[in-house]
Amino acid sequence: MASTYSFDIVSDFDRQELVNAVDQVIRDLKSRYDLKDTQTTVELGEEKITIGTDSEFTLESVHNILREKAAKRNLSQKIFDFGKVESASGNRVRQEITLKKGISQDIAKQISKLIRDEFKKVQASIQGDAVRVSAKAKDDLQTVIQRLKQEDYPVALQFTNYR
C-alpha cells in the first residue's frame, strides 16, 4: 500500500474533440440558410482558430455555433480566448481565438495557496504547467478536488494521474 496518494491538476483539452467541433461548425456554416452565402472561413491551427466573415453579426453567430459544438463535445468554454475583431480586405472581419492550454504560474500559485491555507494535511507543489497535490489519505484528496471545483478560475481544470 502506498504511503502517500497524489493527483495532478492540469489545464488541457482533447485536441481530436476540438477538431471534430470545428469540422461540425464548418458543416453547419455550409448548410445553414442564413450563413450559406457569407463566405465564412474557420481555420484551426496549432494554437488558434481563425474566423473570417462578412460582418460582426455573422461572426457572433459563428461564436455561438462554436460554443455549442464545443459544449456538446465536453470541451470547456474557458479554452477559448477571443481576440479583438480586425478589419480584413473587402469589408470583411477576422478574429483569432487563442486556445488556452496549461496553468500559468500565477494561477498555479493561487491554487497552491488555497490548498495550503485550507488543507493542513495536504501538500501542493507546482510542476511546470501543472500542480501536483499529495496527501496520506485519499479522502483528503477528494475533498481538495471538490473544493477546487467550487472555485472559478480563468482556465479549465482537470484532475489527472490519480494515484
Swiss-Prot record:
Protein origin, superkingdom: Bacteria
GO cellular component: cytosol
Keywords: Nucleotide-binding
GO terms of molecular function: nucleotide binding
Alphabetized InterPro entries for the sequence: DUF520 (IPR007551), UPF0234-like_C (IPR035571), UPF0234_N (IPR035570), YajQ-like_sf (IPR036183)
SUPFAM superfamilies from the UniProt entry: YajQ-like
Nucleotide-binding among keywords: yes
Family: Belongs to the YajQ family.
Function text: Nucleotide-binding protein.
Protein name: Nucleotide-binding protein Ava_2001
Organism: Trichormus variabilis (strain ATCC 29413 / PCC 7937) (Anabaena variabilis)
